[in-house]
């Protein structure tokens, strides 16, 4: 009998795109309450995936993991994947920026291990990206991809010491990861057993449309997006390429 994948709600939509000039931030406690209460056809969330981002999570506070564990346990939830706040650095930046990137991964892995010790995290990855723009990457595509891969390798070695896997999220906005082909190339360059791909399904679809990388477009410009067979064929091309690397959705 197959075991169904664990179904988790993400906390970072409560922060991303929100703030003083937009919609208000959704408080972490409110997100937990909504997650625990949600139910469709008898199916409920098993847990949450947590963005280690302020004001939801203060990564440098010593009691933060304990407070989080108490909150999720109260609602009968588990913690799964974690989003490392790597944007204070960059995987293809200066030496100091790359050092900051790796340090943020280390802190995230340590936090994840604390949650495991507290009994609320039994699975999940640590999510990363290149923390670099597409236009900056395009100034030296090969050189920058090699530098990103080197940073990912350093971060992977740190993560391995904590028993963690890193997953690069396939988003079109991150340099070196902005097309399905570049994503595969970067993963091959990185070549670490504990580094894989996290599929964001909307961005995976955008891969097929060649956003930020028209040369890697699969769907024709005039494709009928109501034609499910055309869509399925395009997604299959992307899926076939990235499936060997995919460790999180």
Language model region names:
Residues 112-141, 162-173:
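Active-site groove signature of glycoside hydrolases
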Residues 10-14, 50-55, 84-87, 131-133, ...:
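Active-site beta-loop-alpha junctions enriched in small/polar residues
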Residues 1-122, 142-146, 150-160, 192-196, ...:
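N-terminal pre-domain/capping segments
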Residues 23, 147, 174-192:
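Short, motif-level signal for alpha-helix interfacial/capping segments enriched in acidic residues
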